Amino acid sequence: ALQIGGSHPNQLAQATRLGCEAGYDEININIGCPSDRVQSGRFGACLMKEPELVSECVTAMKEASTGAEITVKCRIGVDDQEPKRILPDFIDKVSQNGVSSFTIHARKAWLSGLSPKQNRDVPPLDYELVHEIKKERPELEIILNGGLQTFDQAVHEINKGLDGAMIGRTAYHNPMEILANADSLFETNTNKKSVNKIIDEMLPYIQNHLDTGGRLNQITRHMLGLFSGQSGAKIWKRTLSDEAHKKDAGVEVVQNALRNVLEKQNNLE
C-alpha cells in the first residue's frame, strides 16, 4: 500500500496514477496525521472537518486508479468534535462514491496543544465506536488502529466483528514476532525466512539506494528491530547506530553488524 496526503483532487489523482504505475495494490489517503506541517498544507487530520472535500478527493483517486484499491485512514474526530456524531457522517459522505475500506485510529486528534507523538497516546481510545460503525455499516471494510500492542489484542478485536486490525509501532519495533503470529493466524509461510536471509536479500536494495544518492541510515534506521528479543539485538542496534550515519557508510556496515550478531549468538551456544 502507498499512503498519500493532500486536499487537491487533481494532485491526488496524479499521485494515484504514479502509485499505480509503480505497482501498488492499494493507495491510501491520510486523514489522520495532526502535525502542524501537515495542517499547513491542508491535509491529514484537519480534513476530518471537511468530509465533502475528502469525498471529492477519493472520487478523483478512484477515477485515476488503474487497478489499485482506494482506501482511507482517519481518526474518530478532531478537537472539540463529538466523535459519535461526526464519525458516522464522515464515513457516510466519504463512502458514497464507492470507497469501502476505512482504517480508523480510534482516538481524536488535537490539532493544537499536543505533538504528533502525544496524539498517538494521550487522547483516549474508543474501540466501541469503531465497532458500532462496523455493525451499522456491514458492507464496509472497517479496520481498527490505535493502541494495539500485542497480536492477541488485535485478534481479540477482529473476533468481535471487525474486518481487520492495524498494528503500527509494535510491528515496526518487533517485526519478526508479529510476522510469526500472522503466519499462524493466516496459515502462511512468510516467516520461514530467517532474519539473516531477510538481511541478505535487503543488500541489493540498499546498494541501489546508495547508488542513487541515498544514505545508509535512511534504510537501516528502519531495520533496528529485526533482532528484537533475540541475543545480539543490542550489538545489532549499536553497530548500525554508530556507523550507518557516516558519510561513506555502505552495505559493509550491515554485513559487519550481522557478523557481530552471529558471533554473539555462537558464543552463547
Where are these regions (language model features)?
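Proteins enriched for Cys/Gly/acidic motifs involved in redox and nucleic-acid/cofactor modification
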Residues: 41-43, 51, 203
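Short glycine-enriched, charge-decorated loop/helix-capping segments at active-site entrances
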Residues: 42-48, 116-121, 185-186
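Conserved radical SAM core fold
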Residues: 9, 32-47, 108-113
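A cross-family glycoside hydrolase active-site/sugar-binding cleft signature
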Residues: 3-5, 30-32, 71-75, 103-105, ...
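Glycine-rich anion/phosphate-binding loops
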Residues: 1-24, 46-56, 84-88
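Non-cysteine beta-strand/loop elements that form the S-adenosyl-L-methionine
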Residues: 25-35, 96-109, 167-170
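Alpha/beta catalytic cores of nucleotide-metabolism and tRNA/nucleoside-modifying enzymes
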Residues: 56-59, 63-65, 69, 78-80, ...
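Active-site-proximal loop/turn and secondary-structure-junction residues that shape catalytic pockets
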Residues: 6, 33-35, 76-80, 106-110, ...
